[in-house]
Amino acid sequence: MAGLLAAFMLNIGFAKKTPVTLVIVLLLSIPLAGCVNDESDLGEITTVSMTIYHGYSIDNATSNHTIEIELYSGIAPSHVDSFVKHVNAGMYNNTTIHRVIDDFMIQGGDFENGDGTGGYAADWYGYCNGQGLDNVSNCTSPTYYTLPDEADNGWVHTSCKISMAKTSQPNTGGSQFFLIPGDISQHTWLDGIHTVFGEVVTGCEHITTLSEVQTDGYDRPILPVIIVSATVVANSE
């Protein structure tokens, strides 16, 4: 893709209950300077086990998958804190992977509407719909809580990474996330914009399999892809 002008439209939702379209223009497929995964200070590592099925029900699923994701508080403390709080509250259980694009990613985490228009941060991190506010009382509802961007952490969008979905505006990440398949080298146009906050350490081949399911014209799986459960299984420094 080097030297070619390519446009990519990424439909993602955030705290406002309307879909948002992010248009990313890729001029050159060249990695950002200095954007290499730095494992020198991962901080506390939280391991989340996630069970996912593809089909109309778990009993009649065409496939069942279990993956483990390591989350690194040292590279994206707010993102990890929010994600873990959502996991512990059961917010991701029985939610949809609402968007699937082969050779790109699978996206879920909209526990409000299940279609990419909902979700929010698990706590107050200083932003309300992307606007920095001094006081939480100035944000009209917890459903408008969003995350500060932590995309300058040196981690890039290579295979098996987990990253936070957001709009084209800064600091608008909430609860929606996307997982990058194992057959991808790097999505350079996302680096420095979306925050990578961990990686799939077990079962990344399942992300690749799920990224290849049949979808409709809106990138929605024809047969549902459902996160049955997400559970914290380990913590370590």
Where are these regions (language model features)?
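Cross-family detector of peptidyl-prolyl cis-trans isomerase
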Residues: 35-237
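Secretory targeting signatures
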Residues: 1-42
